[in-house]
């Protein structure tokens, strides 16, 4: 028999396209017979057969083993769509019917058979592919989506009788206008690799090369990506390179040995899944090729890698030490992805303090482009959940992120993980009455979109969704019938548009010179103010997090300027307290403190925020003198107050 030629890179752990050889592929044998060639890596197996509907799932066609540990067979007369499995006789004496690890499609759950599939979709997205990049100095505003619960298809039902799903192409037609209306640049899909359990949301994978059949075929998914690209929207795939589902018909003890997983106590994760063995080079090639499939075959624009903390450290526990094999694999994976698809975006969900996660591999970094800022997320949500009267005591929570921000290339994420399992949704986490939650939600998102870092929001955040996410139900679209929720989604769209149209909010955001605190000592007042700078532009961001307004609040600047209001979270359009005819521009006055010689005075609404565009004006030569005099007067006033307090104490 002519064995398939397995590239040496597969055995060295450096292969990114093993799916071109392993799995099932249409071919013609030396005698001219058309059929399908099957190849599976199972070095510990004593025998393997291909079974399917073609023989009634009985005896099967025996496969032959090469010295490489790869079993292969050619079967004529099969057709695309036929189902098959491998009966693997394991080293432990077992004989188990297993799905093909490299199959391109699998039947709908609860079925687990692999499906003969050709990948021959033709894209027409050349213009997009040529201009896409990593968005270093461009907006990156990601919509995180679970394809099965964003919206259900009216009148359709699933095989189990529940509300129907849109297929991939139908989903594109519904979704793309919403993404464009809300100025998202990319959609990030929760894992679409095949998985048996809906409740895992795709994070307990069995078919790493199979696009889940829940929502259609591989060709329909390619059509989804193509449609997004034609409308200028990137597609990012959520990928699970750390652990896999322990189902007996999939990868677990595939050939009767611990082939893909560790054989010790670190072989099982906290979720009951199996941890990949990164010290097995063929496993590294398996994972690299699975990532490569999304980038190459399906034209995805990036990959978000899940649970990276569980790879960097054994069982995700720094006390157990660094898993150097995993670190080496991730470096190799990111290096290979960037070498082959240099304009792709590669992101890590990592909650650890592991160093240089986003540093290039040539500088001994792990090589990711961005890392989720879990600290920013926790501090922000904790602060806004705090009662107003207690906020002065935790004022520093909203300052802390900028102390470490430049250590990595961070992305700010309010993801699906924050709106499930009793954590409450974003709006429901906030302190206060319904009206106070509404006002604070606008300000929280103002803080997110004016803070340095790329952005990601889970579907429903833009609706101010009150119900926690449930993968079995679609979003509560009827919320848009209520004035606040309709106004909020319009505010969210306006905020996203502002983010996309103001270069100072994204250009140079990883450069410390492009950010400056203006007010970060206003603990009692709950006011924060900062400058964003880029392309010669200065934007002043001002945020009041208390439940009372501040009249004539002074902000001290280093230069004289006029200030034009760009965005007001309390505008009546969004359900705020301000009327349309209110003042839109302001000017600094001479005199300040702290070496800042000019003062901008604003009336700050309760729980409200302003974004202002600053235009420099000619300086007053006496401004420094006035500022010094004002500082001296304040110093004398403080000394006088201290003396009076001391005299009272003596009495």
Predicted regions and their residues:
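Short, contiguous acidic/charged loop-to-helix segments that flank catalytic cores in large enzymes
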Residues: 212-216, 278, 320-322, 430-436, ...
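A Trp-anchored, charged/polar loop motif used as the substrate-binding/catalytic surface
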Residues: 123-128, 170-173, 284-290, 388-400, ...
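Short catalytic/ligand-binding loop motif for oxyanion handling, primarily in non-cytosolic enzymes
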Residues: 95-96, 151-153, 195-198, 243-247, ...
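Carbohydrate-interacting/catalytic domains
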Residues: 1-140, 168-179, 183, 436-438, ...
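Conserved alpha/beta catalytic core and glycan-binding cleft of carbohydrate-active enzymes
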Residues: 109-110, 299-301, 315-472, 500-555, ...
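Short, flexible loop/turn elements at secondary-structure junctions
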Residues: 42-44, 54, 67, 77, ...
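Substrate-binding/active-site clefts of carbohydrate-active enzymes
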Residues: 107, 127-137, 146-322
């Amino acid at each position: 028999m002519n064995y398939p030629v397995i590239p040496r890179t597969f055995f060295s752990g450096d292969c990114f396209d093993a799916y071109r050889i392993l799995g099932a592929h249409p071919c013609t044998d030396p005698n001219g017979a058309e059929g399908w060639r099957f190849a599976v890596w199972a070095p510990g197996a004593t025998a393997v057969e291909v079974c399917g509907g073609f023989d009634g799932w009985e005896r099967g066609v025996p496969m032959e083993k090469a010295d490489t540990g790869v079993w292969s067979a050619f079967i004529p007369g099969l057709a695309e769509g036929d189902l098959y499995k491998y009966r693997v006789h394991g080293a432990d004496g077992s004989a188990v019917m297993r799905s093909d690890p490299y199959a391109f499609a699998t039947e709908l759950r609860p079925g687990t058979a692999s499906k003969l599939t050709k990948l021959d979709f033709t894209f027409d997205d050349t213009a997009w592919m040529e201009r896409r990049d990593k968005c270093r100095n461009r907006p990156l505003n990601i919509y995180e989506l679970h394809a099965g619960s964003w919206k259900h298809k009216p009148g359709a039902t699933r095989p189990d009788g529940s509300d129907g799903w849109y297929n991939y192409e139908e989903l594109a037609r519904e979704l793309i206008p919403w993404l464009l209306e809300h100025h998202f640049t990319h959609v990030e899909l929760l894992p679409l690799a095949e998985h048996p359990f809906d409740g895992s949301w795709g994070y307990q994978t069995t078919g790493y090369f199979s696009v889940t059949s829940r929502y259609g075929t591989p060709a329909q998914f390619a059509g989804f990506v193509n449609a997004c690209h034609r409308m200028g929207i990137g597609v990012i795939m959520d990928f699970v390179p750390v652990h896999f589902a322990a189902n007996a018909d999939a990868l677990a003890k595939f050939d009767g040995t611990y082939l893909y997983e560790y054989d010790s106590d670190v072989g099982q994760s906290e979720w009951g899944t199996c941890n990949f063995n990164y010290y097995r080079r063929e496993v590294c090639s398996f994972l690299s090729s699975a990532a490569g499939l999304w980038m190459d075959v399906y034209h995805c624009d990036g990959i978000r890698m899940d649970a990276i903390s569980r790879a960097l450290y054994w069982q995700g526990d720094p006390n157990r030490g660094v898993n150097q094999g995993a670190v080496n694999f991730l470096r190799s994976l990111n290096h290979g992805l960037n070498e082959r698809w240099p304009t792709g975006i590669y992101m890590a969900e990592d909650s650890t303090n592991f160093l240089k996660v986003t540093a290039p591999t040539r500088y001994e970094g792990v090589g990711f482009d961005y890392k989720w800022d879990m600290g920013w997320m926790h501090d922000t949500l904790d602060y806004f959940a705090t009662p107003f009267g207690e906020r002065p005591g935790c004022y520093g929570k909203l300052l802390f992120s900028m102390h470490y921000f430049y250590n990595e290339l961070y992305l700010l994420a309010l993801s699906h993980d924050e709106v499930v399992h009793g954590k409450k949704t974003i709006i429901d986490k906030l302190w206060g009455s319904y009206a106070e939650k509404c006002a604070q939600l606008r300000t929280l998102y103002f803080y997110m979109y004016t803070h340095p870092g790329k952005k990601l929001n889970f579907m429903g955040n833009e609706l101010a969704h009150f119900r926690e996410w449930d993968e079995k139900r679609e979003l509560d679209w009827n919320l848009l019938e209520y004035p606040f929720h309709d106004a909020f989604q319009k505010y969210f769209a306006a905020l996203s548009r502002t983010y996309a149209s103001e270069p100072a909010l994204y250009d140079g955001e990883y450069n410390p010179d492009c950010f400056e605190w203006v007010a970060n000592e206003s603990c009692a007042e709950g006011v924060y103010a900062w400058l964003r700078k880029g392309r010669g532009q200065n934007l002043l961001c001002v945020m009041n997090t208390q439940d009372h307004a501040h009249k004539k609040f002074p902000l001290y600047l280093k230069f004289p300027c006029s200030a034009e209001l760009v965005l007001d979270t309390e505008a009546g359009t969004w359900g705020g307290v301000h009327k349309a005819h209110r003042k839109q521009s302001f000017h600094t006055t001479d005199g300040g403190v702290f070496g800042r010689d000019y003062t901008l005075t604003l009336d700050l609404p309760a729980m409200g925020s302003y974004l202002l565009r600053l235009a420099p004006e000619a300086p007053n030569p006496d401004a420094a003198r006035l500022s010094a005099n004002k500082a001296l007067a304040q110093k004398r006033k403080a000394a006088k107050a201290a003396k009076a307090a001391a005299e009272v104490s003596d009495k």
